[in-house]
Each structure stands twice: as C-alpha cells, then as structure tokens.
C-alpha cells in the first residue's frame, strides 16, 4: 500500500471514529428543561397529538417530524465499488448519505440496514415501516433486484421512493450531457450514444435520456458479453429494453462514429483507440469510481475536440449524485408528493443544467478552489458546493409535483425564492 493511500485510509478511519463514532446524531427541536416541558413532550401531553393523528393521519406531518424525515435504506449488496459486503458494512455509506441530506438540504435522514433472504422480505420490511418517514432513499442494492424492489415499494407506499443509484445518476448525467452536446453544437435526438455498462445506473441513464429526446435506435449498450442486441438469448427483461437490432457486436464497432460515450462500468475499459474512432466533437462521461473508464489525460491526448466528464472531483465536469438527490427530496417533501415521477426528474435535469449557464458567484469559486468558471467544455455542470442548487432544483421539482398532480399541499408563491 502506498504511503498516500495509507494516509487516506487512516484519515478516513479517524474521521469516522473521532471525536465520537459515526457521522450523524439526533437533535432536539423542542425545549426539555422543565417538568412542564416533559409533560408536554411525553405523558400526559403527548396523548393529544396521538388522538389527532389517529383521527386524521395527515396530521402526522403537523405534529411529528415525518415531513422532513427520509430513510436511507440498503441491504449492502452493491456498496460503492466494493460489491456485496452485507448490510452492516454498508452503514458508513448510509450514514454518509444522511450527512449529505442534512448538509445540503436540511433534511433529517436515518440509515436503515436490512438483512433478508429474498427481495420480497426486503420489500415487506420497508413497506411495513414506511409510514414513519416522509420519503425513502434506496441505496447500494444490486441489479436486477433493485428494479423489482423499487417498483414494488413505489406501488405499496404513498411517499416518494427513490433509488438514487439509478435516478440520481441519471438526472445528473442527463443534465451534464445535454449541456455538453449544446457546447459541441449537437442535438440529443441526432446523437449516437454508446453506454458501457448495463446495470442499475446505466439502465436508468438511458431511459431518462430517451425521455429527454434520445432515439432508442441510436443507443448501443454493452455488458460483459458485448453489445446488447436483439439476437441475444441471455438478456433479462431490463436489458431486453435496450436490445438494439444491429449486426455490431463489439465496443470498437459501435463506437465508430459515436457522438457520446457514457461509462458506468469499471476502470480502464475504454481504450484510446476507441476514442479516436468517435465522431467530431464527441462527449465522454467516464463515471466509474474511483477510476474512470479512461483517464482524462489519455482521452485528451487522442482528441482535442472532446468534452470529458468523470465521477471525480479532481477533474472538470464531475458527475456527482449530490447535485441532485438532496434537492429532489427537498422539493418532493415540501410539496408532500406521493411519488417522484418523470416530470419531477426532468424538472431537476433542466434546473441543474440551467444553473451551469449562469455566472458563478465568488463564494462558489472559492469553495471549488478555482479562480474562474464559465459555461463551456470544462464546465457543463454546476459544482456540488454551489448553494444555488437547493432553491433552484427544489423549486423546480416541487412545482413539477404540483403540475403533474402528485403534490398534496399547495406551495407558497414565493417558495424557495427568498
């Protein structure tokens, strides 16, 4: 192990262990200093909101923290780049997600790690506790089970259920890609797209890109066996949706003349020779973490006309889910949405991409550690520390919830405009 990696490892362990173990805690929102305070907080006073909620369940939003509480739930079957290490090992990641909810959107989140033998057991467990929360964020659940789990929970719960590994990735990817194509003078409807990877993130990304205007026949998805095509008999129902009727079978064949490469697979799977075959002014989003499908220096050495994005903060155009999930939940919770639908996702895409075209405030430049940012090849998507994301994305999402009929409360006219 290199000294640098050892130092990072020790720093990370110390960060999680000190001064107290973990990254989140419970805070009180009411005084609890006197006998009267305690009588109101618990017995006998607590009986009054209990009666109100029993008579009208919607009053749980008035008398409890339900409306600002999200469950971050995992079974630990797809932990970051580490794989299936089980529920308990996923707890630091889920606590980290809860930290991000609080830091970026003021949302209280609690991590829940579920041990189960079947997907149905997981679904039943989450559905049974769903009334406690205003929303559910599913995390680090492997494909294809994640698709079944999310869809079943959306059907059974009357609160937003959102698998961030799918839809958060898709929203941020779509926002960045639409902007990158604009910079390159291209339209998504005319663009040939190669997607390396066919798991949860890849599938959601391509589905959302189609809803944003991409043509299905222009999408070429690859898994470990090569191109996903209509002649294959080994495809599950989720991959079958992207089976292209094509004679092409390899990456080198499908990338010849491609406008876009989206990588959600693994490190170093895109050779420089493939980049050289792409159409003029290509876009490469190599989003595998911590190491991308091709390093930016290698790609730029082959093509001076490309736009490059990765999942890393040390390169331009970071494709990071934190640009989306805190704010889409903020808008959904404030509108008391029953679900997060396509209209809300597309509203988030447009809000995120629109922000990248505006002048960048000095405080954002300082937080990003740069002296200048302007819409163009090295800046097609906002920086995660941009405080404008909260009002812009949350407002767009909440308004879309109202307009699409899934909101259950009216929004103030000046919501998130202050």
Regions inferred by a protein language model and the residue ranges of each:
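N-terminal ligand-binding/catalytic initiation module
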Residues: 2-161, 394-408, 415
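Solvent-exposed alpha-helices and their adjacent loops that cap or buttress functional pockets
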Residues: 61-66, 102-103, 128-130, 154-155, ...
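Short, ordered loop/turn segments at secondary-structure junctions
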Residues: 75-77, 85, 114-115, 140-143, ...
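Glycine-rich phosphate/diphosphate-binding loop of Rossmann-like nucleotide-binding domains
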Residues: 80, 85-105, 157, 163, ...
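General beta-strand structural signal in soluble alpha/beta enzymes
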Residues: 111, 137-140, 161-164, 221, ...
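Adenosine-phosphate binding glycine-rich loop
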Residues: 164, 184-186, 190, 288-410
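Rossmann-like adenosine-cofactor binding region
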Residues: 240-307, 312-314
């Amino acid at each position: 192990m290199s000294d640098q990696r050892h130092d990072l490892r020790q720093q990370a362990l110390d960060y999680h262990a000190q001064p107290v173990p973990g990254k989140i805690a419970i805070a009180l929102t009411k005084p609890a200093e006197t006998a009267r305070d305690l009588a109101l907080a618990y017995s006998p006073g607590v009986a009054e909101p209990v009666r109100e909620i029993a008579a009208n369940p919607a009053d749980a939003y008035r008398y409890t923290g339900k409306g600002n509480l999200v469950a971050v739930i995992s079974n630990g079957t797809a932990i970051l780049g580490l794989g299936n290490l089980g529920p308990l090992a996923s707890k630091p990641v889920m606590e980290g997600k809860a930290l991000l909810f609080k830091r970026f959107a003021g949302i209280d989140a609690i991590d829940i790690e579920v041990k189960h033998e079947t997907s149905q057991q997981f679904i039943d467990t989450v559905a049974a506790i769903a009334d406690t929360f205003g929303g559910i964020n599913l995390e680090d659940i492997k494909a294809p089970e994640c698709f079944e789990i999310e869809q079943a929970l959306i059907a059974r719960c009357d609160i937003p259920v959102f698998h961030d590994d799918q839809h958060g990735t898709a929203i941020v990817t779509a926002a960045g890609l639409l902007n990158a194509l604009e910079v390159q003078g291209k339209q998504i409807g005319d663009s040939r797209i190669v997607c390396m990877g066919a798991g949860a993130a890849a599938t959601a990304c391509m589905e959302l890109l189609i809803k944003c205007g991409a043509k299905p026949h222009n999408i070429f998805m690859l898994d470990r066996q090569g191109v996903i095509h209509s002649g294959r008999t080994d495809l599950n129902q989720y991959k079958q949706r992207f089976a292209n009727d094509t004679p092409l079978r390899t990456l080198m064949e499908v990338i010849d003349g491609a406008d876009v490469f989206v990588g959600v697979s693994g490190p170093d799977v895109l050779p420089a020779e493939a980049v050289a075959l792409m159409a003029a002014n290509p876009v490469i989003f190599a989003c595998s973490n911590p190491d991308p499908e091709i390093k930016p220096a290698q790609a730029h050495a082959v093509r001076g006309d490309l736009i490059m994005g990765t999942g890393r903060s040390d390169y331009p155009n970071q494709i990071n889910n934190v640009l989306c999930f805190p704010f889409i939940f903020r808008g959904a919770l404030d509108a008391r949405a029953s679900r997060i639908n396509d209209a809300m996702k597309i509203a988030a895409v447009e809000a995120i991409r629109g922000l990248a075209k505006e002048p960048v405030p000095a405080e954002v430049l300082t937080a990003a550690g740069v002296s200048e940012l302007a819409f163009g090849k090295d800046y097609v998507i906002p920086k995660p520390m941009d405080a404008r994301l909260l009002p812009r994305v949350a407002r767009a999402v909440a308004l879309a919830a109202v307009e699409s009929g899934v909101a259950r409360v009216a929004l103030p006219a000046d919501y998130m405009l202050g």
